Amino acid sequence: TSRMEAATRATAQRKTQVATEANERHKATNAYQLDIPLAWYGKVATWQNGNTMGIYALSGSNQEICRLDALRNGETYQGDDTVLGTVSLGNGASVVVHGKVLPYQIAQTISGRTEKADDTYSMDEAVELVELATGNRYAYDQIKHDLVGKDGKSDKATKLEKDYLAQTLLPSIKAEN
């Protein structure tokens, strides 16, 4: 009987933990709601200002991974960041996800190809940010050696980050009721 009770308690605790994680991953503005990717759970935090939401690393860098903006029908994104994805909310509005292409930017910074003062990362931060931006699908060394290349173009790294977000974050974005 004690084994059965222990198993029942363990199952109940696991269900509670899963529900807590799901609740903590769920975020919402007045215009949309989303779920933070499971691979980011406990590693990122969010900030919100109206219908703009930023997702940033909890590491010492506090580097923003991406930002989401709700746009009304006919509006277009006017920022300097790379558009990483767009989701129609079905009500005439959409959410644009944008940000720096972190795998590319970090590899360029570490290899000395950029001199922007705000683009400095410790190796630990570089590794963590690449893992967050790619969902642990690529390691920092792979990005540095395989994807950035000598031509200085970010196309492959951009595709990698867009593909990851398209599979994880974008499908969770829905209109807020």
Label the predicted regions.
Residues 51-53, 93-95, 147:
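Hydrophobic residues embedded in beta-strands of well-ordered beta-sheets
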Residues 99-177:
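Surface-exposed amphipathic alpha-helical segments
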Residues 35-86:
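Secretory pathway targeting signatures of secreted, lumenal, and periplasmic proteins
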Residues 21-36:
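Short aromatic-glycine motifs in intrinsically disordered, low-complexity regions
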